Amino acid sequence: MKAQPSCEVGKGSGINQNKPVYVISDLHIGDRSPRDNLCRANRESLLDSFLHHVENQKGQLVIIGDFLELLRYPLDNVLARRKTLLDRLADMDTVYVPGNHDEDVIRWADTTNPPHPFFARISHAFVRHIGGRRFKFMHGHEVDPLANAGIQNLGRVIGRLAYLCEFRQGACLLSNDTVIGLLEETGEQLLHVWTWLLAGLHTALRESCGRLPAGRIRFLTRRIRTQRMLTRYYRDKTEGLYDIAIVGHTHRAGTFGDWYFNSGSWTGARSNFLRITPDGDVGVFNWTDNVPQPNRTVVA
């Protein structure tokens, strides 16, 4: 397992505990090119209405990882083409904890001159006392034994290939997100298989698309990984590192017991978020038709 940062590390530990805290993750935002996740369906307008809701509720927004999709899209392009969104999030005093898909930006956590004001409140994973309990805000890859350097580097290669191919309309390609999910579940064995697959990339991917939809692959692999990771979260909890885990990473919004809360993602059919009251009560919601709808999913 990767070493985790000290519990109190991070600018995020200064969030206002007198406000409701709204938590989102896994938006995987790109540079506005055709397959940018936020450009699909009505996700851009959904996010806009959600941000209005947070502002109207005088809430504190916390983004816990994979906000940006930097395994596929060049950072400079994203910063240039998403400036309006970044400006708005900076004005909202948003706290940002990077994940494994946007970990490149964590280097700005210790600088006084980030490339945009949004990154002024970038933070490592942190613990915050709310309602008398210790809440750990983290992406979740920190306890994922398969989110290792080898997978990450290969993911960058796959992401760049996907970026070059994505302008081909109607191409039957598994998404970068799907391929990385498969790699994380099968580890080193699939790395060898992937070397062989590269020789017949287009044929293999076309056949895979016909046999098993990408969405089904993601569902199966993430469910297995969630169950494995819950054991690791619980061990950290029992060792006294925190009382409540506020995490993302698996794209599966929901709860486990009264201590694990996952913020889901904004990449699927539903867009999810968490709301934490000043008293420490946590709710899981879907943002549907511009209003919050309770999500009562138990993840395992």
Located regions from the model:
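Glycine-rich phosphate-binding loops of NTPases
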Residues: 295-300
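Core catalytic region of metal-dependent phosphoesterases/phosphodiesterases
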Residues: 14, 18-24, 29-131
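Membrane-proximal helix-turn-helix segments that form the acceptor-binding/catalytic region
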Residues: 86-87, 189, 233
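Short, solvent-exposed aromatic-acidic interface loops
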Residues: 285-294
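Active-site-proximal loop/helix segment associated with metal-binding centers of metalloenzymes
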Residues: 140-229
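Acidic, histidine-bearing metal-coordination/catalytic regions of metal-dependent phosphoesterases
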Residues: 1-19
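Conserved beta-sheet core of the metallophosphoesterase superfamily
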Residues: 113-125, 131-136, 141-162, 223-285
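Surface-exposed, flexible loop/turn segments at secondary-structure boundaries
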Residues: 29, 69, 102, 143, ...
